[in-house]
């Protein structure tokens, strides 16, 4: 069933599986995963450039749907691990990777020549910051790599998060490398990744997929490809709109987290329990969305995407977004606030931060995940160490090899009672918070998991 939502604004189309009578969706023109499974996916040669948190799950989904997939990455060590059946990310189990390898439809490679002959190339590479500004170096490099092997009739899709206009920049790179013209010789589109590491409910298949193209033909081809992989496809008329949509999603979240972080600090100074106020506000069934205060934001998206958006505003609207920049400043200041608050609390208990034994619970940026990219918990650990504290951390999701310079422990039984302070930074459900509160001399809770008491203080 193809649903068209009409309004005074540019039209957005939502494409879902139709389980009724035959329609255009059933004929394989556009459809969700359900429709495609009835008519069968036309097997294609698919190259997914970048085999990380975004590219690897997508590559395996494409292989499972019947495509022949090259999972390309310039990291040879990562590719060697993939070839041996060792997944580098938690969202892909080793046995799932091994099954894809044994099925013969997924082949990891670091050799550019293996990209020859692709029908569809999906680019899923990092988009970091360089000196506080967007860095498209990985996209440009991937575009040159893909462009060398681009042939007439192929389709290129960008999934990397970036500012509006990036897909057209990629198009310039592809044209320069291939000698072909986008639209006339090859298709080009943008479909923003929406990966949430560790989320078992919203996966590649179940999360609605926004798709766009530089023209109607490209849009239809992008939609057809993803309709064979996911439950619902959302068509957006222009790539720039889809690019802005992704930045809007994460900027909305980052700004609202900054609001509650700021209000939590104001409420603390005024002697008001902010979390109780937040719970009361969340009882309103309309017009309110609850966000939790914490030690900062992490992951590849939230610390970076708002900066891309504010930079884009400066380039095209006459100035940066003061709201977005202030939100980033508030969120970025939280790790230092945690350390300063902890130092003051220890001082009030007759203990200096320098030389204190500090146990950190959680290093990843979110519960249930081992992803420490841009994690505020890691920054807290580094700041504490710089202040002379003796820091150990426990995070069952984070391998010791990932936590460079931080001592990771597995057994909490002796460390909790021995610590001058236990700091809850990532609220993994596997921690026994009641027992920790009972055994610890002092708990500094940044996540609201332990009830405040004479020995428990909340951020």
Predicted regions and their residues:
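Structural/interface elements that position substrates and couple domains in central-metabolism enzymes
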Residues: 2-7, 34-459
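Compositionally biased low-complexity segments, especially N-terminal hydrophobic helices
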Residues: 3, 19-24
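Short, intrinsically disordered low-complexity segments enriched in Ser/Thr with adjacent Pro
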Residues: 9-21
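Low-complexity, intrinsically disordered segments with a bias for serine/threonine
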Residues: 10-11, 25, 40
């Amino acid at each position: 069933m193809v649903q068209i939502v009409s309004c005074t604004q540019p039209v957005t189309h939502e494409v879902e599986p139709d389980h009724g009578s035959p329609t255009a969706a059933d004929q394989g023109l556009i459809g969700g995963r359900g429709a495609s499974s009835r008519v069968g996916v036309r097997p294609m040669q698919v190259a997914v450039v970048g085999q990380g948190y975004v590219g690897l799950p997508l590559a395996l989904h494409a292989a499972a749907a019947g495509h022949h997939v090259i999972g390309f990455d310039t990291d040879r060590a990562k590719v060697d691990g993939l070839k041996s059946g060792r997944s580098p990310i938690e969202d892909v189990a080793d046995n799932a990777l091994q099954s894809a390898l044994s099925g013969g439809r997924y082949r990891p490679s670091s050799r550019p020549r293996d990209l020859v002959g692709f029908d569809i190339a999906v680019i899923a590479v990092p988009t970091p910051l360089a000196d506080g500004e967007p860095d498209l170096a990985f996209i440009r490099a991937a575009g040159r790599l893909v462009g060398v092997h681009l042939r007439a009739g192929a389709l290129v899709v960008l999934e990397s998060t970036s500012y509006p206009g990036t897909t057209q920049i990629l198009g310039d790179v592809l044209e320069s490398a291939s000698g072909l013209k986008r639209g006339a010789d090859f298709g080009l589109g943008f479909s923003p990744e929406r990966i949430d590491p560790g989320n078992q409910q919203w996966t590649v298949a179940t999360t609605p997929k926004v798709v766009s193209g530089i023209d109607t033909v490209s849009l239809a081809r992008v939609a057809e490809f993803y309709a064979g992989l996911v439950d619902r496809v959302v068509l957006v008329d222009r790539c720039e709109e889809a690019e802005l949509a992704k930045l809007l999603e994460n900027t909305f979240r980052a700004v609202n987290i900054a609001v509650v972080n700021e209000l939590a600090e104001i409420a603390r100074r005024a002697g008001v329990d902010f979390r109780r106020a937040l719970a009361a506000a969340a009882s309103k069934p309309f017009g309110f969305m609850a966000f939790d205060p914490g030690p900062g934001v992490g992951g590849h998206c939230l610390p970076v995407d708002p900066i891309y958006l504010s930079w884009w505003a400066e380039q095209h609207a006459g100035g940066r977004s003061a709201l977005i920049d202030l939100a980033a400043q508030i969120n970025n200041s939280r790790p230092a606030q945690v350390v300063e608050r902890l130092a003051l609390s220890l001082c009030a208990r007759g203990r200096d931060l320098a030389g204190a034994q500090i146990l950190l619970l959680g290093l990843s940026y979110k519960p249930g995940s081992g992803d420490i990219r841009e994690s505020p918990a890691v920054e807290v650990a580094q700041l504490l160490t710089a202040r002379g504290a003796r820091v150990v951390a426990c995070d069952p999701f984070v391998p010791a090899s990932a936590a460079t310079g931080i001592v990771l422990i597995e057994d909490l039984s002796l460390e909790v009672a021995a610590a001058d302070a236990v700091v809850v930074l990532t609220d993994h459900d596997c921690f026994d918070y009641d027992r920790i509160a009972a055994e610890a001399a002092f708990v500094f809770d940044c996540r609201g998991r332990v009830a405040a008491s004479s020995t428990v203080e909340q951020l």
